[in-house]
Amino acid sequence: MKKYVLTLLCPLWLVAQAQKPVATPEKPNVIIVIADDLGYGDLSCYGEKTIHTPAVDALAKQGLRFTNAHTTAATCTPSRYSLLTGLYNWRRNDTGITDGDAAMVIRPEQTTIADLFKTAGYTTGAIGKWHLGLGAEKGGQDWNGFITPGASDIGFDYSYLMAATADRVPCVWIENQRVANYDPSAPISVSYRAP
């Protein structure tokens, strides 16, 4: 009788095991921090004794740190372009430091690191100084409406950006390709050309 019960229970147990959901490993969060005018020697997690950087140190302790990193350029637009596209900035003539009314340097048809992360199932975002241009042509942005192409056209699900730098107009924040807190009674007009 025991043999009969075991013969009956074993297949039932195997079927029950096959029905259990398989746990999928959780993907790690990936945060890339780009800081202008900051060398690795400026951070206390890399040995700096004078400047204390506890927030960055906490991130470094919990995550991955670069110990042998290189850049294609020592300035903003070119290094951002190369990081996001994986391409050398000096192979294009429009990847120098951009004005606030520059056309977007990264073309929507180019593959970016954001595209690769999205393909891998990540939600992507870009926050902070953009300095890669926005819109299709220099000076052609509609600062009072939807600005395209922009970050969503090159793989980012969410963006909250400053177009260039705090010393280059327009000095506004742009959320998902629209000026944040836009006031229609005070339209924005930007020109880098002499009147």
Predicted segments, located by residue:
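Bacterial Sec-dependent N-terminal signal peptides
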Residues: M1-P25
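Formylglycine-dependent sulfatase
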Residues: Q19-P195
